[in-house]
């Protein structure tokens, strides 16, 4: 709803389905996209009597589902958030599996400020992520673990590094205590960046260095898949930084992308001007997906953006 309203398109069920289906039937789905994280509404939608997960699967892509119910105010730390959605999750997971989902996503969210994230927020969200992951693996699906340290604020990249390390280490401490099979999980972290209001100027190389150092020190070796969130970066920034991380990667980790805005925004803007221009919208989306996929191999250059 927010995405459509941001480009002045009325957020009706039909319009949401139109945009989603435009992306889901693009050629990039076959060549670039490995999985799609759906919302509860989307996984139940149909287009021409075909369920959305079926359309996605037919294009060689795996349907997944966001299963948390959002971040609420954390008791005894009202400036912070705790993600909810554990109640009834076991039953919902059975339903989602039957609807075609094969992986899931749960997002913990953390703010950086003088005294935040607090130990309470870090431990509460890590515990919730571990309980979620245990239920998902029990249901025969792959859990995406998403502890997002937000870019909001004036903090430096070095502070982001310290706080993100603390958050991720606590997540794995809880995941291990819940006997999670780490090989059957995917981590969706933020990159190490200065806050959006920070004066710090930092290169893509420095971002990659800090991000790689943080993850090598905080993530167990059994975790093979790491898919970055874009977290408010522009399309080009998110692509360039992912590319640099892969160029400098000497670990066994596979680094890819799990982008929302940084994958869809240009396509959404194009579509909003004429929601029936399926081909034009798909061309824009195909280009962005190709750029991100090249970056996931360390093969992107800025010159390719002009073509």
Question: For each of these PLM feature ranges, what is it?
Answer:
Residues 12, 106, 145, 187, ...:
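Conserved, mostly hydrophobic/aromatic
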Residues 1-99, 112, 200, 204-210, ...:
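Alpha/beta catalytic barrel-like cores
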Residues 40, 108, 189:
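Residues that line or immediately flank small-molecule/substrate-binding pockets and catalytic motifs
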Residues 151, 155-222:
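Catalytic core of soluble alpha/beta enzymes
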Residues 62, 142, 184-186, 225:
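Proline-centered loop/turn at the N-terminus of a beta-strand
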């Amino acid at each position: 709803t927010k995405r459509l309203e941001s480009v002045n398109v009325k957020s009706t069920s039909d319009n949401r389905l139109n945009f989603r289906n435009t992306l889901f039937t693009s050629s990039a789905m076959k060549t670039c996209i490995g999985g799609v994280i759906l919302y509860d509404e989307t996984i139940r939608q149909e287009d021409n009597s075909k369920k959305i997960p079926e359309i996605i699967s037919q294009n060689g892509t795996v349907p997944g589902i966001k299963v948390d119910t959002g971040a609420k105010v954390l008791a005894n730390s009202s400036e912070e958030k705790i993600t909810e959605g554990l109640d009834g999750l076991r039953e919902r997971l059975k339903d989602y599996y039957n609807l075609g989902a094969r992986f899931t996503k749960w997002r913990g969210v953390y703010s950086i400020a003088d005294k935040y994230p607090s130990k309470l927020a870090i431990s509460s969200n890590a515990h919730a992520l571990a309980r979620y992951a245990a239920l998902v693996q029990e249901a025969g699906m792959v859990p995406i673990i998403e502890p997002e340290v937000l870019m909001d604020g004036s903090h430096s990249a070095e502070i982001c590094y310290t706080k993100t390390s603390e958050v991720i280490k606590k997540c794995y401490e809880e995941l291990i205590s819940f006997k999670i099979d780490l090989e059957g999980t995917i981590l969706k972290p933020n990159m190490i960046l200065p806050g959006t209001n920070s004066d710090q100027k930092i290169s893509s190389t420095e971002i990659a260095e800090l991000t790689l150092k943080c993850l090598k020190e905080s993530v167990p070796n059994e975790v093979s898949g790491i898919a970055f969130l874009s977290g408010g970066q522009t399309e080009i920034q998110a692509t360039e930084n992912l590319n640099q991380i892969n160029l400098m990667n000497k670990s066994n980790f596979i680094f890819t992308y799990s982008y929302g805005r940084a994958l869809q925004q240009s396509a959404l803007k194009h579509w909003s001007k004429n929601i029936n221009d399926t081909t034009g919208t798909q061309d824009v989306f195909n280009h962005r997906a190709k750029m991100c996929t090249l970056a996931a191999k360390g093969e992107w250059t800025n010159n390719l953006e002009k073509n």
